[in-house]
Amino acid sequence: MKLFKCLTNSTKIRIFAPEKVKTIIKMREGAEFRELMLQVVRTRMAFRRSMQRTLKKNNAGITFEMLQVLSSLWHEQGISQQILAERIAKDKACLTNLMNNLEKKGYVCRKEDPNDRRNKLVFLTPAGEEFKEQIRPVLDQVYVYAEHIIGIESIETMLSELNSVYDVLEKI
């Protein structure tokens, strides 16, 4: 039986039978894409931790997940909970819990949709608007700092590439 030498990721030389080589090559197919997806997840977690630290340091009294809801409403109010859940990538049960907590804090309210009584539309309250005015400049500092360090050109390139990845994944 003829044997092949293959390099593993750790650069140690291993000897494999020909049928094993095919299996190893097949296992490695897609490894770069898998690593890319892991890095996207790690980056999101680093972003979450950074925002959590910023919120805590400024005594915001909300979680990153609550911030996601509020941030979405800062861009558009009067949207259904279903649309809001899709925009922040949360399931309905999780969003309901977040909404309950934000209502208790007085930052949001839900109103019946006049076109469909089964749906609730979500709005910021005056307290939610006031909170936005207080916390948004602090959050913007995080974005400005990161943008300054990374560079606009690099960010534009990464954004374009990630949009391509998104388009591919949506088609699969």
Residue ranges and their predicted role:
Residues 68-71, 86, 133, 159, ...:
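A cross-family signal for key residues in well-ordered alpha-helices
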Residues 100-160:
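Charged, amphipathic alpha-helical coiled-coil/dimerization segments
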Residues 34-52, 80, 106-112, 120, ...:
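Extended, non-catalytic scaffold segments that flank or surround catalytic motifs
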Residues 45, 49-94:
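N-terminal helix-turn-helix DNA-binding core of bacterial DNA-binding proteins
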Residues 97:
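DNA-binding alpha-helical recognition surfaces that contact promoter or target DNA
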Residues 40-43, 47, 54, 88, ...:
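Alpha-helical linker/hinge and terminal dimerization helices associated
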